[in-house]
C-alpha cells in the first residue's frame, strides 16, 4: 500500500531533521521510503512510503509524533483509480 504523510514540525527544523533521520534509519518492519521532501506552505515536509498495511503505517506516525505532527493519506495510482471507475 502507498501512503503520503504530510508533516508539520513541532520543534525547530534542525531538531526535526535530526530526529527524522533517526526514524528513517530505523523504520518499522515492512516500510519502504520512496521519497522525503521538504516543502513550502502549510506543511514542512512530505514522506511518500510503502507499508504492508494501515497498521504498519500508523507505527511510523507514532514514532514521528514526538517532533512532528503527521496527516497520513492512503494513495492509489491514477491507473488504479480509473480501473475502479470502470467497475462502477
Question: Which residues does each predicted region cover?
Answer:
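Alpha-helical interaction segments
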Residues: 27-28, 33
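An amphipathic, aromatic/His-enriched active-site/gating alpha helix that lines ligand/cofactor pockets
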Residues: 31, 52-80
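Short beta-strand element of the conserved SAM-dependent methyltransferase core
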Residues: 5-7, 49, 72
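A generic structural signal for short beta-strands and their flanking turns/coil linkers
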Residues: 29, 41-45, 66-68
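Short, intrinsically disordered low-complexity segments
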Residues: 34-60
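General N-terminal targeting signals
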Residues: 20-24, 48-50, 62, 66, ...
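Short S/T/G/P-rich N-terminal loop/turn motif that feeds into the first structured element of a domain
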Residues: 1-27, 39-43, 55, 76-88
Amino acid at each position: 500500500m502507498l501512503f503520503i504523510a504530510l508533516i508539520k514540525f513541532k520543534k525547530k527544523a534542525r531538531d526535526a531533521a535530526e530526529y527524522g533521520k533517526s526514524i528513517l534509519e530505523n523504520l518499522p518492519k515492512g516500510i519502504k521510503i520512496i521519497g522525503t521532501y521538504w516543502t513550502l506552505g502549510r506543511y514542512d515536509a512530505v514522506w511518500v512510503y510503502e507499508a504492508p498495511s494501515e497498521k504498519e503505517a500508523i507505527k511510523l506516525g507514532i514514532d514521528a509524533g514526538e517532533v512532528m505532527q503527521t496527516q497520513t493519506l492512503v494513495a492509489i495510482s491514477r491507473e488504479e483509480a480509473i480501473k475502479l471507475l470502470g467497475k462502477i
